[in-house]
Amino acid sequence: MWPMLWAFLISSEGSPSIIYLFLFLIGVVLTRSAGCVINDYFDRDLDAQVERTKDRMLVSGQVTTYEAIILFVGLIALSILLLMLIGLDILVYALAAFCLLVIYPISKRYIKIPQLVLGIAFGSSIPMVYIVETGETSLSCLLIYLATISWAIAYDTYYAIADKKDDIKIGNKSSAILFGEKDTIYPFYFHILTLVILVAVGVINNLGIIFYFSLALALLVSTYQKILVSNRLPYQCISAFENNNIFGLIIFFGLLLSYLYAVSYTHLTLPTSRAVE
């Protein structure tokens, strides 16, 4: 959700369309929910072999596979209706996003770093935001997308560390397995890469010091996460994963306050400029 909100603020220069913003927020809830359902559907046999996930509703029988499919189809149908309200200009990106929802859980069986697929899926709303706000994509759009992918690899690796031993046993693939003994270090590097890319976004869009200060705070948060997972205790890895909401929130407020300051500064200096004229 946070990268989508970043994209709205940057593409609109701090004045996003409230209607589109509201529709996209609903869309994120629907598609993420659909993603969780289809992920649990494909992973149900594997989840039964993992200590942390063996009690999930599909595994325990609280929900049948038929009910899961019906729920998934219903969520996708609502997403399509929402797409029609937003506009068909983003149809290609939306279709790609729907495909990625299905591909991601399957990718964990075949791709060594499925978190890359996850990042591409989670960032798919960014070009859609740019199209509805500006009518086109741009370099900033691409950079925010790349930052989102890098960030997804970072935080989902923490999540994957929690299940690493079980994933190795059952043959699942993950970035945590790929990174080996450096599985607690590489996520921090990807956090740094994310922030470096966002610095470039800030330069391109002439963002103020408040934004860069928020990136510095986000770096402190990512440092805390690195320390948190150092012992690889599953509950601490999950906490580090969840803590990334703070990372995204800080950057969002950095953008928001940066644009609010720019607007207030313009209003304060405008009368003086007119007086000189």
Residue map of PLM features:
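Core segments of transmembrane alpha-helices
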Residues: 1-4, 73-76, 118-126, 187-198, ...
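Helix-coil boundary and interhelical linker segments in multi-pass alpha-helical membrane proteins
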Residues: 7-23, 80-92, 127-144, 199-211, ...
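Multi-pass membrane catalytic core of lipid/isoprenoid biosynthesis enzymes
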Residues: 23-28, 44-94, 169-209
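Intramembrane alpha-helical segments
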Residues: 26-28, 33-34, 56-139, 143, ...
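Alpha-helical transmembrane segments of multipass membrane proteins
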Residues: 31, 35, 79, 151, ...
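Membrane-embedded alpha-helices of multi-pass transport/permease systems
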Residues: 34-38, 42, 89, 153-172
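Extended hydrophobic alpha-helices typical of membrane-associated regions
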Residues: 196, 200-264
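Conserved small/polar residues in nucleotide/adenosyl-binding loops
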Residues: 265-272
